[in-house]
């Protein structure tokens, strides 16, 4: 992820946490499938994301609850597994989708700046409040499309 803003105290989307039996995960239906998603709802969790993972098991992933609805840019920093990303507005409408490809890791001769500059950015292109990362190929497998609604109410 490229940038990030602080959380406001009145962010109603964080109520999702109170509805889950496990405060670190959320069960969500995406298309016809049920997923167990890790929640990234704090600055540290958003920055960490799925970095360092070698794979993403079927029907799992991560739901990012961003501090505000705006254009979001994600990257595959230290991510070793391809994945799909769904960008959703505050109403749960898919505004953009990407298949994000794993990048080669930073090598010992590469500066941090050069490493970051070579990473591809995946943009929501329109304001998004939520980002869902799921296993690669699930967008196609589930026949998801821009404009489709994902019910985020629990």
What are the roles of these predicted feature ranges?
Residues 11-154:
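Compact, glycine-rich, soluble single-domain proteins
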Residues 1-10:
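Short acidic, low-complexity intrinsically disordered linear motifs used
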